[in-house]
Amino acid sequence: MLYKGDTLYLDWLEDGIAELVFDAPGSVNKLDTATVASLGEAIGVLEQQSDLKGLLLRSNKAAFIVGADITEFLSLFLVPEEQLSQWLHFANSVFNRLEDLPVPTIAAANGYALGGGCECVLATDYRLATPDLRIGLPETKLGIMPGFGGSVRMPRMLGADSALEIIAAGKDVGADQALKIGLVDGVVKAEKLVEGAKAVLRQAINGDLDWKAKRQPKLEPLKLSKIEATMSFTIAKGMVAQTAGKHYPAPITAVKTIEAAARFGREEALNLENKSFVPLAHTNEARALVGIFLNDQYVKGKAKKLTKDVETPKQAAVLGAGIMGGGIAYQSAWKGVPVVMKDINDKSLTLGMTEAAKLLNKQLERGKIDGLKLAGVISTIHPTLDYAGFDRVDVVVEAVVENPKVKKAVLAETEQKVRPDTVLASNTSTIPISELANALERPENFCGMHFFNPVHRMPLVEIIRGEKSSDETIAKVVAWASKMGKTPIVVNDCPGFFVNRVLFPYFAGFSQLLRDGADFRKIDKVMEKQFGWPMGPAYLLDVVGIDTAHHAQAVMAAGFPQRMQKDYRDAIDALFDANRFGQKNGLGFWRYKEDSKGKPKKEEDAAVEDLLAEVSQPKRDFSEEEIIARMMIPMVNEVVRCLEEGIIATPAEADMALVYGLGFPPFHGGAFRWLDTLGSAKYLDMAQQYQHLGPLYEVPEGLRNKARHNEPYYPPVEPARLVGDLKTA
């Protein structure tokens, strides 16, 4: 053994060839700060070996290196700029020394080589992959950019266009695509990976392969003519501006850095990468996006822990076809759980099957499946007008009309047709689960399962625990949701549960702004362009359906009369009374016409102004700051109340539910991350300016207490203690 660290070791393999093996104690290899330092020590040992002829890098895990240790990022981002820059210089000196070894090097990569793992691979002369490899640089998705030389080496290896596409979008590619673009040099079966890598090294050692020529382009300026450079970088900047926008500075920073570094050799190019990385690491956007990644891991880990002792349902059923039922049936069948879809109406069944077939055909058009797979999936959805097959199902989700009487009748009837251990769930969006449970003989086998539309796209499923729902029931439904590829978050029961409960105060803020003379177009523009929502409140209401919102608003008002009962007729009432239901009937805040692709396109409609004039004061202008404050304060207050009341268990789950269920702007990280970034005292000052608008603007006591003590909702993070010889970097 030449060297043994905590996460890697170095040993002779054969005849002057050494192997450096990443072998962390856990299930995966991560390139954390300690591993970078250990890698530097191992390379130091290699530099002393006079009989070294070649080096092979590999992993003892199912994945090469999954990336940097993202759990370190938030503390790393708190390190002062100068110190962080110094550490990056040290880390890059390690990869430079790997790249500069006086012998040929090869990385044998399997599973994943992402982020720092990819950058480690880029520092070797040759790269051999297994067919399951995913390789790429996802850093821009976390609000940063490659910091271990990825933005320098990849463009010089692949050419600017392919590298820019991967780096700016934070993409990873499979082994075949990596081979095609030159990111790897060969793809071999897993069992032949090490032998194949040794064979390449022997060829390089024997002079059959010119490893020095292979290495040289990575040390030099990017080979691009002035015209080629102008075209590549202009197109890339245009694409990034269009897709990422101003709220995500990392992609455009990465492109501009690669452009600026193009005319320099490795050392100066790495300095430019360093200078760009450090300021990005100190942005609120980076903290928010890393926070989302960590919260996502937490939520998925919680679901995994919850379901470790239950069997995932093998057969499911959906009550109520149509678009929603068809969407649920498709998602279940697509992920391998056969489903019976029941309705009392043949027309609805046809609609449900058509929806499932349409979604499968889209997969076929994209080349994700072939005709055989399509037929196989569709054959596992069984439409029925009766209860045939219900004696075999493990879980049933009810997705009928949003009416408590109808839902209770359907659930009570279904309970008599299934096994005693079958779990029932309701896809209600607002009706309390404990109320629906009153109709059942086995309420412990019942809970809520709230999907979001469109089912195949929206990642969140709210699992609602009723007063009598058993732990096993919750676990089974969480297991099914996870199997369907969704992110399940368990919440406690109340009108609207979590997501709709916090959405309707936001809509109330919108209605009050309209009442006070604001223009709905400006509100939408501000909430989309400035705050970052995917759609403004007026457009969102049109998409959700004015009739749906009108009904839900009444349910919420009955559930929380002190805050949500209004004493005036609002814009939602006015549009509902005029039969303007939004996209579903072509008239809402806008008029809708189908474009060439059959998608609804919004157009101005003068008639809506007369309707809104009935419920609004004369038009007046509001500042962007006031619009954002008046829209967001009611929502954030309600989010905090849900945490204080135990409706949602943690800030992490609340923020993920908002991001995955409502499209809360990811660069804000969710309501609690936004609160922590803003500071609770500053938020309190802002909210107090609008307390005169009513109870929705009154800040909960728990949040006032946080403001008094200057406490965040997320646990405070200490700056990282960086490992490595920074002075000699």
UniProtKB/Swiss-Prot annotation:
EC number: 4.2.1.17, 5.1.2.3, 5.3.3.8, 1.1.1.35
One cellular-component annotation, GO: fatty acid beta-oxidation multienzyme complex
One GO term (biological process): fatty acid beta-oxidation
Function of the molecule: Involved in the aerobic and anaerobic degradation of long-chain fatty acids via beta-oxidation cycle. Catalyzes the formation of 3-oxoacyl-CoA from enoyl-CoA via L-3-hydroxyacyl-CoA. It can also use D-3-hydroxyacyl-CoA and cis-3-enoyl-CoA as substrate.
Family membership: In the N-terminal section; belongs to the enoyl-CoA hydratase/isomerase family.
Catalysed reaction equations from the record: a (3S)-3-hydroxyacyl-CoA + NAD(+) = a 3-oxoacyl-CoA + NADH + H(+); a (3S)-3-hydroxyacyl-CoA = a (2E)-enoyl-CoA + H2O; a 4-saturated-(3S)-3-hydroxyacyl-CoA = a (3E)-enoyl-CoA + H2O; (3S)-3-hydroxybutanoyl-CoA = (3R)-3-hydroxybutanoyl-CoA
Chain positions recorded as substrate binding sites: 296, 500, 660
Molecular function terms from GO: 3-hydroxybutyryl-CoA epimerase activity; delta(3)-delta(2)-enoyl-CoA isomerase activity; enoyl-CoA hydratase activity; long-chain-3-hydroxyacyl-CoA dehydrogenase activity; NAD+ binding
A Pfam family it matches: ECH_1
Pathway membership: Lipid metabolism; fatty acid beta-oxidation
Active site: 450 (for 3-hydroxyacyl-coa dehydrogenase activity)
Chain residue ranges for the region called Enoyl-CoA hydratase/isomerase: 1-189
Keywords, sorted A to Z: Fatty acid metabolism, Isomerase, Lipid degradation, Lipid metabolism, Lyase, Multifunctional enzyme, NAD, Oxidoreductase
Superkingdom, taxonomy of origin: Bacteria
Site feature (Important for catalytic activity) residues: 119, 139
Subunit comment: Heterotetramer of two alpha chains (FadB) and two beta chains (FadA).
Region (3-hydroxyacyl-CoA dehydrogenase): 311-729
UniProt entry tagged with the keyword Transmembrane: no
Residues bound to NAD(+): 324, 343, 400-402, 407, 429, 453
Protein name according to UniProt: Fatty acid oxidation complex subunit alpha
